[in-house]
Amino acid sequence: MSQRGISKGLLVCHSVRLAKVWVDQIEISIPLGVEPEPKQIEGISDLIDSLHSYDCSVCSVVAHKLDDAMCRWCELLLDA
């Protein structure tokens, strides 16, 4: 595997891990009523876009889970 392939593989792996951490944090924040900050929404949106850009079925599944969690989290802003 080339150096570029290894680097992309690590990036994909870290992106998936980060997304899973965000899903866990969002699941904790929603019942507590902690609203997302604009920078968090922007960062998570960028992460979702990145996950969708990889040719990886796992990335796509994780991106959809994160997107669903973020949508539920953003509903707190509508209820405020």
Curated annotation (Swiss-Prot):
<protein>
    <recommendedName>
        <fullName>Uncharacterized protein Gp-e</fullName>
    </recommendedName>
</protein>
